[in-house]
Amino acid sequence: SIYKIDEARGNPVERNPGAWEKALWVWHDVNEHWNYPDDCMTIVEVYSNCEEVELLLNGQSLGTKHLADFEDRIYKWAVPFTAGTLEARGTKAGKQATLKRITVGEPTGIQLSTYEETVAADGKSVAHIVAQLVDENGNPVKNQEREISFNLRGDYRLLGVDNGAPDNVQDLQSNSLITDQGRSLLILQSTEEPSSIIISAQGEGLSSEEITIITHQEL
């Protein structure tokens, strides 16, 4: 970690103060989940333009902090991990914004989603399909990885797959890959033939429901 605990105040502080001002084009890894070993000391960062933010764990306040107190403009708390709900409540000009993270279970399924439910059958239009590992309650699982495969039927051109990791070296021209933060991306291109492209995903005992993308001739 780039942080250590200030024993006098119990707050996280940088191991090398001011290093963030000198580091170019790099950033430390961050996780968008609340799943860690019990009592693991975790640095919680909150990115916000609110004047102050209160952090709560399972309804208990862990203190309110002010943006002006953080030179790098990132709120920070040192929190021993306890399963449950982590909530940040920000206040700005009397208005409140809230963001929560919950402890999730083991992956039990795959959820597929896309913004492009219909695309033109012009041989150029593209559809992006995101596969996300989810637990039994449908919560995104972002702390575990699985290898998943996409199954497709219809007229399409496979442009590739990716998981968003900057160090990903898996085969782009494939219908399977290992997730990163529980996610993977499938990119398809239409042909000039109208079609219904039916997509599902499976892997390591997990499966998804089917989704359909319609390619159509434009009028």
Question: What spans do the regions from the language model cover?
Answer:
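Short aromatic-acidic-glycine turn motif
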Residues: 65-67, 109-112, 150-167, 219
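Short beta-strand elements
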Residues: 98-106, 206-219
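Substrate-binding clefts and catalytic carboxylate motifs of secreted carbohydrate-active enzymes
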Residues: 1-124, 136-137
